Each structure stands twice: as C-alpha cells, then as structure tokens.
Amino acid sequence: MAGFGLPNFGQLTEAFRKAQQIQQNAQKLQEELDAMEIEGSSPDGRASIWLSGNQQPLRVRLEPSLLAEGQDASETAILAALQSAYEHSTTTMKEQMEELTGGLNLNLPGMSD
C-alpha cells in the first residue's frame, strides 16, 4: 500500500540497491585513483611532478640543466609542473566521478566547476 504519499516498497528497495551499488563502485574508484600516476610538466619539460588520482604527491623529476639556472628558474618550473599535474588529476577525478554517478547530478562537494 502506497498511501499517504509514501513510496511503494519496491521503489524503496530499488533505491537502496542503487545506493549500495554506488557505494561499492565508489570504493573501487578510490582504489583506482590511489593507484594512478598522473604527470604534470613545466612548459619546457625540465620539471615533472607525478600525483595520484587523489592529488597525493608521488614523485618529482628535475633536469640538471634546470637546477644549474638557479633557484628562481627552478621554483617557476616546479610550480608550473605542480599546477599541470593538479589540473590533470582533478580533471581525471571529475571524469571518473561522473562515470560512477552515471549523470545522477549529485552535486558533490569539490566536484563542481
């Protein structure tokens, strides 16, 4: 009986089933993002930074020629590489979350533009 504006039991059961599936998929996605290595590089390619899909720093590579140019050049290149890696990582995370939610428009914190 679906009186008094309450959903019927079948709809409620289906909603819970979908919620459980999303939760399982979210756990799998978390593991996949943790395992990813996403590279960002400075425009000249002499500085590279790798982040996980969850923006955890993993590695840094600096070419000796960059270090020879001094602190300012090194800092500028490192910042550019970090910004590039962060942009790639957040884009990847957003795309993966959109796949997970299947366009449910959940409006998750930190996932909006």
Curated annotation (Swiss-Prot):
Gene3D superfamilies: Nucleoid-associated protein YbaB-like domain (3.30.1310.10). It is found in: Cytoplasm, Nucleoid. Keywords: Cytoplasm, DNA-binding. One of its GO terms (cellular component) is bacterial nucleoid. Signal peptide: none annotated. Pfam families: YbaB_DNA_bd. Homodimer. Binds to DNA and alters its conformation. May be involved in regulation of gene expression, nucleoid organization and DNA protection. This is Nucleoid-associated protein P9303_00241.
